[in-house]
């Protein structure tokens, strides 16, 4: 999951457009963006993705819209 802490002027339309831009280039980097959450008031955005590593996630954001995450948290899925 990557976290953008403060995107100035964040709107639902803007985050949707940025997510769409990610989807258009994600395959080039072996990434699959799953979903995102945002809070317009604070400017925070959380992006859930499946990727081989953090560098691949950063590359997608860099090439699609330039809004690099402030944090990338690498996690493994638990078994139920």
Per-range role (PLM):
Residues 28, 64-67:
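Short, well-ordered coil/turn elements that cap or connect secondary structure elements
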Residues 5, 48-50:
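Short hydrophobic/aromatic beta-strand micro-patches
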Residues 52-54, 65:
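Short, surface-exposed beta-strand-loop junctions and turns on beta-sheet-rich folds
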Residues 66-78:
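Conserved short beta-strand edge segments in small beta-sheet-based binding/regulatory domains
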């Amino acid at each position: 999951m990557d976290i953008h802490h403060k995107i100035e002027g964040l709107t639902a339309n803007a985050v949707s457009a940025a997510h769409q831009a990610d989807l258009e280039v994600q395959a080039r980097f072996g990434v699959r963006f799953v979903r995102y959450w945002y809070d317009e008031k604070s400017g925070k955005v959380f992006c859930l993705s499946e990727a081989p590593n953090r560098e691949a996630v950063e590359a997608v954001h860099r090439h699609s819209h330039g809004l690099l995450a402030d944090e990338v948290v690498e996690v493994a899925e638990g078994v139920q």
